[in-house]
Amino acid sequence: PLVLDTLTIAEPSFKKSPVISLIKRPYIQFAHDWNEHNKQDIFTAQAEYKLLESKLEALEKKKDVTAEEIAKLQTDLSNMSPSNFRRIAVDDVTPESLVNLLEENGTLLMISDESGMLGNFSGRYSNNIPNLDLLLKSWNGETYISDRATRASIVLKKPYMSICLACQPYMFDSMINNPVFRGSGLIARFLYCFPVSNIGYRKYDTQAVPEA
């Protein structure tokens, strides 16, 4: 799939938010329509997964159960991925949440009129320990493995994610001067846009106020 990372840099009042909202709208609408159309199938698959989990828990509590019986149910459960409602566009997301969303959806679009969300990956909530691996690997679909002590490992075989952000110049300066972003090569993967201001020259299609 095509992956593009774009960053628009503009001063306040450049209508960054309306433009980002316009870009995001069809993705939100498509996900909504798809989820509505497949809602019953999703709920059915979720119920089947929970039933199989309950069967496995009940089987493990039996005294006369064999290892083969447990292994068979575990295999069946591992082959049945839990269904979730489709997500395409994500906004303010943490690295941990992004792993789960990519596991469920495979491909995503990170889109926001605030590039400050990239601070989530530079260590804002992890004691200044950066976590850019997933952003880098989802650019070309490289396998990503998330190991956590409190849960099973998550393996993303081919994660893909495009990034579409807009920010003010001071945020852009902080990104350029961030050694983590520069050293990782992340900022070199973006296409940058510096729009020319049209303040004072904008045309509106609103009806004129009639004279009294």
Region spans (language model):
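Phosphate-handling catalytic cores of nucleic-acid transaction enzymes
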Residues: 1-212
